[in-house]
Amino acid sequence: MYQPTGFANTIFAQRYAINAEETFEEACQRVANHIAVAENGSREKWAERFTEVMVNNKFIPGGRIWYGSGRMKGQLLNCFVVPTEDSREGWGKTVSDMLIISGTGGGVGINFSPLRPRGTPIRGTGGEA
């Protein structure tokens, strides 16, 4: 079984362990249990498989996955692209989604492609974009 030493252990303990007592093997089990939910079939079987390859250093997930797995507000991805609809409600939902994602550590990009061009008439208000 792989056990991080020296600088690798320092980084693991400071950034990825849930607390000072969590060992590398326990962290592997935590991450494996979290990501096994996405697999078809027995969650326990997949968690065992993931744990085995991780503790033997055959597969090491990205840092965000280590950090976010098993935490209440953890993100497993660094970046998100948020769609937006061309309406007041759509803009509000986009801002709300952006705040939630940013608040849990994710980066946000917004797709403005669906928005109408400047000068386009707005139905119901008589205004223009």
Predicted regions and their residues:
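Extended catalytic cores of very large enzyme megasubunits
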Residues: M1-A129
